[in-house]
Structure formats: C-alpha cells, structure tokens
Amino acid sequence: MTSRRLVFGLSALLAVLIIGLLIASGVRFDNQDVDPAPASSQESKRQALAEKSTLIADAAKRLAASSPNSSVFPRVESAASAYASALGGVWRPWPNGAPSGRTNPPVSTSAPANADASFLALKLGELSREAVAAANSAPASQRQTYLSVALDARLQAVGVATHAGGKASCGDVDPVAAGKAAATEEALSGVEAARQWLETDVASLPANQRQAGISRIDSIKAAQSAMISSGAKDRRPAVVALPKLAAGETLRGAALKRSSSALVSGAAKADKPNGEAAVSYACSLYATQEERDSAGTLLKK
C-alpha cells in the first residue's frame, strides 16, 4: 500500500513539474484567441508603405533583368529595399505559416508582369506622397524615417520618369513654406553649411555657367529667412569648413545632401508637421539628373 502511494505521489509530482515547464515555455491551456489585435491607423499606414516599397523593389528587379545595360533600375531596387527595411518590413502575423483554421492576411508585394518604367515612376510618386501623409500623423520619433523615404522616392521617381522620356514633378516648390516647416536651430545651421559649400562650388564654375547655382543659393537664403522669422535661433557660424569628400563625391553633391538632411530633420521636429513643403523643396534643389544620381540612397540598409 505504501509502495502504491509512493508511486502515485511521484507520478503526481512529475505531472505538476511537466505542466509547470509547459506553462513556463509559453504553452497555454485555455481557449485563448490566437488572432492578432487589429492594427492601429498608423500601423496600417506603415504596413502599406512597406508593402509598396517591396512591390517597387520587385518591379525594379524585373526591369533590371530585362535592361541589363541600365543603371537606373538596379539603383531603384536597392533604394526600395532600403525603404522596406527602414520601415520595419512587411508584417505577417504568422511568418512561418498560420495555425489550423487561420490564414495570413493577403499582402501586395509582387509587381504585375507587364510593369514598365512608367509604372515604376507612378508607384514611386505614390509612395512619396503616402510617406509624407504618414509622417504628418506619426509620432515625432518616426517622422524622419517617413520623410527620408518620401524625399528619396520622389528623387527616384523623377529619375525613372526622365529615363523613360517622361516627366515627374517634385511638387509645389516653395522655399518660404519649406523654411517655415523646418524652422529649427539645427536645420538652419545645416542649410547654412550647404549654402556656403554651394557658393564655393559656384565660384569655381565659368561665369556663363553660374546662374542656375546662384538661383539655387538665393532660394536657400529665402528658406533661411523663413526659418528665422518662424522662431529658429540664429547661431550660424560665419565660416563653415569644407567637408571631407568621399571617393567620387563632389562638393555640390555633399552640399545637396546636407541641405536635404537638414530640411527633413527640421520638418520631422515641427510642432505642426508640413512634410510636403520640406520634401518638395528639398527635391527641387537637385536640379539635374547628375545631381539626383549623386544623392545615392538617402536611406541605407
């Protein structure tokens, strides 16, 4: 009798230990709902942007395969992949397969077989506008990522459209509105550095090739005045040292990157976000395809 009780007691103890280990490892014995919680409005926007970025990368990859001599499509594929990564990727509730009775929601990440350069430019433009909208409603900590995606995608859209013989717009360009949208001390100082570098670059050109550069500098001055009138503290240094250029980088390219970074950063910190003003103006500063090519990918993987 004592032996039976001992065996029973040990069996019960073993069962308790096994159940404890199962619970500790996450096994649940209740009828819990395994469905994910509904996505918030902001998460839905993020997911849509990640999906569209992945679709754009897929379209660019296909176009690159059919146009092996073009550098445009591989560049877009790399950029769009960087967007998707920066945005957190395409979320699936069950990435390794849904449990019995459940299915992963559909995602749109594959480009149509007949996607061409015009389709690619269209989707890049859509992505840019939607990223601006997401930035304007996002927490301040997330805005810079959205606005960086928006600006880079817009530059890529203009480049692809030009390659296809068409035209794409940077949007409604207004340096004063951009300055108001990015009115921070840091943005003002960043744009000041860019302005001084551009002045050095223009001075190195033949006299008959300077007008476009001078007009660009004048527009930056207008943006700076708007920043100051909107409350940005003016602590600009009298002289900004020239940057150390990477291999193949030009002073003009470095200046344009500095200005776009400052505008995006300033707009991301605004109390009342107006990302479109900053993005459209920053895009317009890249006046030629050569300059847009020099931007590279503003977001790195």
What are these regions (language model features)?
Residues 2-301:
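All-alpha RGS (Regulator of G-protein Signaling) helical domain and cognate RGS-like helical scaffolds
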